[in-house]
Regions:
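Acidic/histidine-rich helix-loop elements
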Residues: 2-19, 40-43, 71-92, 137-140, ...
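Short, well-ordered beta-strand micro-motif
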Residues: 118-120, 130, 216-218, 252-256
Length: 260
């Protein structure tokens, strides 16, 4: 099964090259798209996002929000990130999150913001759950309880349990492992965005270990271990459009059955 992980597009309507790149990812013929948020980078960003995502219409997908699906970016001092995870900006501009939700629903993608769902992809049953953005503390892990109990009461057992969030804070990853996730997907970090060759990321913008700021690794908690993939994402804030030694990325994961 091919899973396309998209994150942190921070889309603005004039970003035609990025829109074209995302459209062309449909040629990879993914079986499932996982969107881990921060889709919008401008109050008119949905226009560009529609241009990018339209080729995925009909492809199963799941999504969660990042803070930039709720609030427009603002100018800030980039050196402030060295003092720890970024805070809440003053008087941010509210984005049209409901229009974004309606569009992703129309594509056929399932909303996992503090929700659970069962999806079937290529005949494979997947139980999925997710949270709204932990960076803004919009996550509500308690809200997952009834849905998870309902999924586990079904006769058909899932082949895979997927945990999806925007920002990979330790408390969220721990909770996902506790709730039975086999695979964890997140974004938010931009892979550090500015990295030092031979050393890696300087900051993570959350509390995940620096060496797990991007890529595939594992996460262990309470005696269980799950696979973890953190995307470096495809975009940046329009007010800090710089990456160094950290290329933008979309990730195609190929999942195979465990050997008997």
């Amino acid at each position: 099964m091919k899973v396309l992980h998209l994150s942190d597009l921070h889309m603005a309507p004039w970003q035609r090259k990025k829109q074209r790149f995302v459209r062309e990812l449909a040629d990879l013929e993914p079986d499932l798209v996982v969107d881990t948020g921060d889709n919008l980078g401008h109050r008119l960003g949905l226009l560009g996002l529609k241009a990018a995502f339209e080729p995925f219409r009909g492809v199963p997908g799941v999504h969660v929000w990042g803070s930039n699906d709720w609030w427009a970016p603002q100018p800030k001092n980039p050196f402030a990130y060295f003092g720890g995870p970024s805070g809440v900006p003053k008087q941010p501009e509210r984005l049209d999150t409901e229009a974004l939700r309606a569009y992703l629903d129309d594509l056929g993608w399932t909303d996992l913001n503090n929700r659970t769902a069962r999806v079937t992809v290529c005949g494979v049953v997947i139980d999925a759950f997710g949270t709204d953005d932990p960076h803004r503390e919009y996550d509500d892990l308690a809200a997952l309880g009834p849905g998870l109990r309902g999924l586990r009461s079904r006769k058909v057992r899932p082949a895979l349990t997927l945990g999806v969030t925007h920002a990979p804070y330790r408390r969220i990853l721990d909770a996902f492992v506790d709730r039975g996730a086999d695979l964890l997907l997140a974004g938010h970090t931009h892979g550090g965005q500015v990295c030092v060759p031979g050393y890696g990321a300087l900051v993570t913008n959350c509390d995940i270990p620096r060496e797990q700021v991007k890529g595939v690794s594992s996460w262990t908690h309470g005696g269980r271990t799950a696979a973890l993939e953190v995307s470096a994402g495809l975009g940046t804030s329009i007010y800090a459009p710089v990456r160094f030694a950290c290329r933008p990325e979309a990730t195609l994961l190929t999942l195979t059955a465990r050997s008997a």
